[in-house]
Amino acid sequence: KLLYNYYRIGGVNGDLNHEFMSRLGTWMSRAAKQIDSNLGLLNENELFVRRTRNLGTLDAATALRMGVTGPNLRASGVPFDLRRDRPYLVYPELEFDVPTRSEGDSLARYLVRIEEIKQSIRIIDQVLHEMPDGPVMAKLPRLVRPRPGRAFGAVEGPRGVYGVYAISDGTDQPFRMRIHDPSFVHLQL
């Protein structure tokens, strides 16, 4: 299991073994094929489509004004994805599409998320085949004292952009820290 405590400052808690990578590759091949066939039942279900079309419509201007990001923003017609538009880590080397719809309703948000699953499988497949051997953790001191200053970092997560703004006074604990979770913005709509 890869839980939240798997990721560490400087790397990850442990390396992925070849058995896991092989099983993941097999699972992804099956999942990619099943997504289209299984979702066809839901996508073509007249009742589902009728109940989600034109429901909870969010236009692009309102989404931008309210700070909406991620699939909710892309379902409103704004094709912004931090991984593509302000690339970080290995994303510049990966090929993926940014699913976007213009309707802004619940159906559009659902369809964007389904396409995001397909793109995630595509990204994972590329990374699995290109993952280099070597250490999975940087050699860092147990206690890190950053220089005094400010820093902001952001990543594209499944619900939108997650950001952390930190102010350091040079000690081992942040002087100030603000964590931005996209769900907080989305709950206000």
Predicted features and spans:
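Active-site bordering "gate/hinge" segments
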Residues: K1-L189
